[in-house]
Amino acid sequence: MSKINKVVLAYSGGLDTSVIVKWLQDTYDCEVVTFTADIGQGEEVEPARAKAEAMGVKEIYIEDLREEFVRDYVFPMFRANAIYEGEYLLGTSIARPLIAKRLVEIAEETGADAISHGATGKGNDQVRFELGAYALAPGIQVIAPWREWDLNSREKLMAYCEERNIPVDFSNKKKKSPYSMDANLLHISYEGGNLEDPWWEAEEDMWRWSVSPEAAPDQATYITLGFEKGDIVSIDGETLSPADVLTKLNKLGGDNGIGRLDIVENRYVGMKSRGCYETPGGTIMLPAHRAIESLTLDRESAHLKDSVMPKYAELLYNGYWWSPERLALQKLIDATQEHVNGEVRLKLYKGSVTVVGRRSDNDSLFDASIATFEDDAGAYDQKDAEGFIKLNALRLRIAAKTGRKLS
């Protein structure tokens, strides 16, 4: 690694990244630029400014990226109906490409030689940040302190802070959650602590965004979501921005006990990891989007989308958002969304999301006159089915005549 004069750090203002500021200054004798993104994590980001200033940081970036995050990352992902390993809605994965993008942009703006992040050497986030950075700025240098230093425990980090007068408040350390948590506008995740035993049931007081399904209201909540080109643009007739859509759906879902998930997933780095997630808004969005597609997409387009979805989800999970293959898949997916317009009505009740209606005034491919079980007035000639069946059975009949066994 060549001489580092200036580094842009993804800075949260918490213990780990506050230690990293001073560690970078001490280890590399360099100037540190901090970048703090508000992507809906639910915490005040302004205090990060005072902490950075107290450590001698001269260039401080604090940005509200909530709208960009939902519009340019969350919504495109949901157009793909992306789910990793059948369950995970990719809430952590989707936040990393935007942060990586801004890190390298700020590095270019400030003339920095490198970027840095607080992801550990065991997790997926180090891969996601760095693949994104190299895709966008191939010459950038990356410093990952967790892969270099020996501060491998919370106690060592706290001691480092006290030795160097790093401004971190330890007054509430006894109240600190036993879990490693990460949040953005799409979800909040919980890892570590007792969750490292996959048989251990998470305590009820761990969950922060939702009530338990048992404690949810006894009366169902009905909502109507409006779609334009595959994206939600309104809730119950009220036009909302992308970030406001997700914020409102999170509240509706959380109030009705929706969006909890407890899984063991396969990390890209090779190990299995248990994680608990709350994704109330996303858990509503996914079936709603599939419902409006069921009405407006033709069969083969829908099936093609379903066939590429697992690859899309895997690319995103593994950190390849900026790869040519993900970008190519996105163009394919977006092309299918031109006529995904209309409304979906949903019932939210004690942890469940049920589609109860869907309609599209101009783009519906559902023709009741053909699909009806009643008299269709000649709209569909049932005799045509005989030839269709015989043609499709031809290869099966030929194979059967050879005496091939079917099992």
UniProtKB/Swiss-Prot annotation:
On whether Cell membrane is a keyword of this UniProt record, the answer is no
Record-listed L-citrulline binding positions: 88, 93, 124, 128, 180, 189, 265, 277
Any single Gene Ontology cellular-component annotation: cytoplasm
Which BP terms from GO are recorded?
Answer: argininosuccinate metabolic process; L-arginine biosynthetic process; urea cycle
The UniProt entry, under Gene3D superfamilies, shows: Argininosuccinate synthetase, chain A, domain 2, HUPs, Single helix bin
Supply the PROSITE patterns for this chain. Answer: ARGININOSUCCIN_SYN_1, ARGININOSUCCIN_SYN_2
Q: Which organism is it from?
A: Alcanivorax borkumensis (strain ATCC 700651 / DSM 11573 / NCIMB 13689 / SK2)
Q: Which family does it belong to?
A: Belongs to the argininosuccinate synthase family. Type 1 subfamily.
Put simply, this protein is called: Argininosuccinate synthase
The protein's Enzyme Commission number: 6.3.4.5
Q: Which GO terms describe its molecular function?
A: argininosuccinate synthase activity; ATP binding
Q: Which residues form a coiled coil?
A: none
Q: Which HAMAP family match?
A: Arg_succ_synth_type1
Cystine bridges: none
* Keywords carried by this UniProt record: Amino-acid biosynthesis, Arginine biosynthesis, ATP-binding, Cytoplasm, Ligase, Nucleotide-binding
Q: What is catalysed by this protein?
A: L-citrulline + L-aspartate + ATP = 2-(N(omega)-L-arginino)succinate + AMP + diphosphate + H(+)
Q: Where does ATP bind?
A: 10-18, 37, 118
- Give the source's domain of life in one word: Bacteria
Outline the subunit composition.
Answer: Homotetramer.
What gene name is given for the protein in this entry?
A: argG
Which compartments is it annotated to reside in? Cytoplasm
| Pathway(s) per entry | Amino-acid biosynthesis; L-arginine biosynthesis; L-arginine from L-ornithine and carbamoyl phosphate: step 2/3
Which residues of the sequence carry a binding annotation for L-aspartate?
A: 120, 124-125
